[in-house]
């Protein structure tokens, strides 16, 4: 199995598990959400491969098959981890697609390293621009909400995950229709296998301030968000992010929950393949507008 070394903790290497599928110069890097792994992109992987892309997925530190260190659960480190991956794979031009927490990596990577090698960016149900309510960010969420989540994860993270996924997929509306009991259980199993340290330490990272990072995005960008997202309401995240990025396209999935990459995969995949282009037909970085 392929791994990339991103650091060390004591005598042990910190390694990220990744998968690299397809071929060609039109490369897409998919960055997963909390508390899942790169495998959560399965419905997008097949669609993007069919459209002629090379597709790379990886597991964030602490999740999936990657190492589970006790440190590094902040967006500067997450961006550095991503940098290690694209450097190892010698990617000269690639598009970044982030879901949920992964939207933060898209923003911070470009904010930290510029968009020099990034052709396009896609943020799906993302955490940017800034979730915490402050004097200069009145649209944010009260800090006590995040404190409550941390308490719930600390007290009994498995019970927290089970409850979290109800609003992740809006199961009261879509269970048995757009998501099966088996798929829901599979998500729980992945979450349960995550690092206990990571599942707690990532919560305060959700309210990282990405406003400067988002403002630095100067490449074609697509923001996709569900209108019924209960985890990251669209008005607090997706709509604001799209407004802060010059020329960004906003695509609203009507009735879509947080995890539209699963429940509304056909709609998301159509948007993705249209925006990213089909294989080498379109030059990397060329702008498409509806």
Go through each PLM region and give its residues:
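Alpha/beta-hydrolase fold catalytic core
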Residues: 1-29, 50-53, 91-92, 273, ...
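Conserved HGGG/HGGXW glycine-rich cap/lid loop of the alpha/beta-hydrolase fold
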Residues: 9-71, 85
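Conserved acidic catalytic loop of the alpha/beta-hydrolase fold
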Residues: 77-94
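Flexible "cap/lid" loop of the alpha/beta hydrolase fold
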Residues: 107-112, 116-155
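Conserved alpha/beta-hydrolase catalytic His-Asp/Glu region
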Residues: 132-141, 152-215
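Short beta-strand/loop motif that positions the catalytic acidic residue
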Residues: 217, 223-225, 229
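Conserved alpha/beta-hydrolase "acid-adjacent" motif
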Residues: 230-236
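Catalytic active-site module of serine/aspartate enzymes centered on a nucleophile-bearing elbow/loop
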Residues: 246-290
């Amino acid at each position: 199995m392929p791994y990339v070394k991103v650091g060390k903790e004591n005598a042990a290497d910190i390694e990220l598990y990744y998968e690299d599928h397809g071929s060609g110069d039109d490369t897409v890097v998919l960055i997963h959400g909390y508390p899942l792994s790169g495998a959560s992109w399965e419905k997008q992987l097949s669609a993007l491969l069919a459209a002629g892309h090379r597709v790379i997925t990886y597991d964030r530190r602490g999740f999936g098959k990657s190492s589970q260190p006790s440190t590094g659960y902040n967006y500067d480190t997450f961006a550095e981890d991503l940098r290690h991956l694209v450097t190892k794979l010698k990617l000269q031009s690639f598009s970044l697609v982030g879901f949920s927490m992964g939207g933060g990596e898209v923003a911070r990577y470009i904010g930290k390293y510029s968009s020099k090698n990034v052709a396009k960016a896609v943020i799906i149900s993302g955490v940017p621009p800034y979730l915490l309510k402050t004097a200069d960010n009145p649209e944010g969420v009260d800090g006590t909400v995040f404190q409550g989540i941390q308490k719930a994860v600390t007290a009994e993270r498995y019970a927290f995950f089970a409850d979290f996924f109800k609003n992740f997929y809006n199961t009261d509306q879509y269970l048995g229709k757009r998501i099966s009991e088996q798929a829901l259980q599979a998500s729980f199993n992945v979450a349960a296998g995550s690092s206990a340290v990571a599942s707690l330490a990532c919560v305060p990272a959700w309210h990282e301030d990405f406003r400067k990072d988002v403002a630095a995005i100067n490449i074609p960008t697509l923001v996709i968000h569900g209108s019924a997202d209960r985890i990251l309401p669209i008005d607090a995240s997706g709509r604001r992010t799209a407004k802060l990025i010059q020329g960004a396209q906003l695509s609203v999935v009507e009735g879509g929950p947080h995890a539209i990459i699963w429940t509304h995969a056909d709609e998301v995949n159509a948007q993705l393949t249209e925006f990213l282009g089909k294989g080498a037909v379109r030059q990397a970085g060329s702008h498409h507008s509806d």
